[in-house]
Amino acid sequence: MTALTPPQYEAELLQRAKSIAGLTFAELAEELNLVVPPDLKRDKGWVGMLIETALGATAGSKAEQDFSHLGIELKTIPVNQQGYPLETTFVSLAPLAQNSGVTWHSSHVRYKLSKVLWIPIEGERQIPLAERHVGVPILWQPSSSQEQRLRQDWEELMDYIVLGKLTEITARIGEVLQLRPKGANSRALTKGIGKNGEIIDTLPLGFYLRKEFTAEILHDFLMD
């Protein structure tokens, strides 16, 4: 695996993803001349970077899909021995200001989730990082009922944002999506709308997919 140009076709991307399934992180890193860190404490994004490199992902900015020329977003998903997701999945930052006129159809969440290449990875902490395996890829598009559920949650959560109810948002709102603070620390502030319509300093919030929803995606794939 040498110069990794971006895949030109969806089938080529899927073939690349299938070709790395079953490899350990150490084996894949060796092919790419990368060093496996001892753990992820200081390198939280290392696994994502490893998979992106192996597949030739191009997104220069997080605002774009990872394979924007193919209309595909890449998501690694850590799972346990039973294949159940170990964490929620970040989708995109929520527009806390300048969000008038944003609809579900023009939203970043819908754009990012229109087609996703899921790469399950072994994520249990007792498995040394170098020995964890890459799983079988899943190319997914939301069914109409899944999109309806996503849309319902997105619209409910956006209502809180637009109406200046930021302080009322909790991670419990939403069936398949949730809003949570997104940032390395509580000092990273952004602008939002206060309850009287004024501009306030607030924590950046991110949309996350709940584990139950991503578990459903993985389960549906295995049942096919």
UniProtKB/Swiss-Prot annotation:
Protein origin, superkingdom: Bacteria
GO molecular function terms attached to this record: DNA binding; endonuclease activity
Keywords: Cytoplasm, DNA damage, DNA repair, Endonuclease, Hydrolase, Nuclease
Keyword Hydrolase: yes
Single GO biological process annotation from the record: DNA modification
Pfam family, any one: MutH
Principal location listed in the UniProt entry: cytoplasm
Xref: CDD domains: MutH-like
GO CC term (a single one): cytoplasm
Compartments where located: Cytoplasm
Keyword field contains Nuclease: yes
SUPFAM superfamilies in the cross-refs: Restriction endonuclease-like
Protein task: Sequence-specific endonuclease that cleaves unmethylated GATC sequences. It is involved in DNA mismatch repair.
Family in the record: Belongs to the MutH family.
Listed name of the protein: DNA mismatch repair protein MutH
Native source organism of the sequence: Histophilus somni (strain 129Pt) (Haemophilus somnus)
